């Protein structure tokens, strides 16, 4: 571990349309090659499609989807006496959100719809209802942690 001072967390400005920090963070996750305007168009387009498809508030759907995709525990490799063990550890709250957002984006990319906006809208709606790729990924991670519960005494 470095002995220098801790680097302060950057303040993320809320997005212009909803004034929500999590939406702004999600845009940064969706963004590729620094094209923020494209990411903004994708996310806002997905939110509009959520409104037309389900008639629900897109922010509500987004936060529900995010909560359903957040992992509580994950496994980390720990080397003990020449053997690697998958040790279950609790996930920090900031990492929970980051992982959930990443999984939502990745699951949306793998979907079959035409545009990324449509894929994202579909994935968010699915995740809000407790299904979809991101929720499946979370269940998989939880299953791994449950299977390796015996090694939890090797905590970090």
From Swiss-Prot:
<comment type="function">
    <text>One of the primary rRNA binding proteins, it binds directly to 16S rRNA where it nucleates assembly of the head domain of the 30S subunit. Is located at the subunit interface close to the decoding center, probably blocks exit of the E-site tRNA.</text>
</comment>
<protein>
    <recommendedName>
        <fullName>Small ribosomal subunit protein uS7</fullName>
    </recommendedName>
</protein>
<dbReference type="InterPro" id="IPR005717">
    <property type="entry name" value="Ribosomal_uS7_bac/org-type"/>
</dbReference>
<keyword id="KW-0689">Ribosomal protein</keyword>
<dbReference type="Pfam" id="PF00177">
    <property type="entry name" value="Ribosomal_S7"/>
</dbReference>
<comment type="similarity">
    <text>Belongs to the universal ribosomal protein uS7 family.</text>
</comment>
<dbReference type="GO" id="GO:0019843">
    <property type="term" value="F:rRNA binding"/>
</dbReference>
<dbReference type="GO" id="GO:0003735">
    <property type="term" value="F:structural constituent of ribosome"/>
</dbReference>
<dbReference type="GO" id="GO:0015935">
    <property type="term" value="C:small ribosomal subunit"/>
</dbReference>
<comment type="subunit">
    <text>Part of the 30S ribosomal subunit. Contacts proteins S9 and S11.</text>
</comment>
<keyword id="KW-0694">RNA-binding</keyword>
<dbReference type="InterPro" id="IPR000235">
    <property type="entry name" value="Ribosomal_uS7"/>
</dbReference>
<dbReference type="GO" id="GO:0006412">
    <property type="term" value="P:translation"/>
</dbReference>
<dbReference type="InterPro" id="IPR020606">
    <property type="entry name" value="Ribosomal_uS7_CS"/>
</dbReference>
<dbReference type="InterPro" id="IPR023798">
    <property type="entry name" value="Ribosomal_uS7_dom"/>
</dbReference>
<keyword id="KW-0687">Ribonucleoprotein</keyword>
<dbReference type="InterPro" id="IPR036823">
    <property type="entry name" value="Ribosomal_uS7_dom_sf"/>
</dbReference>
<keyword id="KW-0699">rRNA-binding</keyword>
<keyword id="KW-0820">tRNA-binding</keyword>
<dbReference type="GO" id="GO:0000049">
    <property type="term" value="F:tRNA binding"/>
</dbReference>
């Amino acid at each position: 571990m470095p002995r220098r001072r801790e680097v302060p967390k950057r303040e993320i400005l809320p997005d212009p349309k909803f004034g929500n920090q999590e939406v702004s963070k999600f845009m940064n996750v969706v963004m590729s090659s620094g094209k923020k305007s494209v990411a903004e168009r994708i996310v806002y387009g997905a939110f509009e499609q959520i409104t037309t498809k389900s008639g629900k508030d897109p922010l509500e759907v987004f936060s529900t989807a995010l909560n359903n995709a957040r992992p509580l525990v994950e496994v980390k490799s720990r080397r003990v006496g020449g053997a690697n063990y998958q040790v279950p550890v609790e996930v920090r709250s900031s990492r929970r959100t980051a992982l959930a957002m990443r999984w939502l984006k990745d699951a949306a990319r793998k979907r079959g719809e035409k545009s990324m906006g449509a894929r994202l809208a579909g994935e968010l709606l699915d995740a809000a209802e407790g299904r979809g790729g991101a929720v499946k990924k979370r269940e998989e991670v939880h299953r791994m942690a449950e299977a390796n519960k015996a090694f939890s005494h090797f905590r970090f």
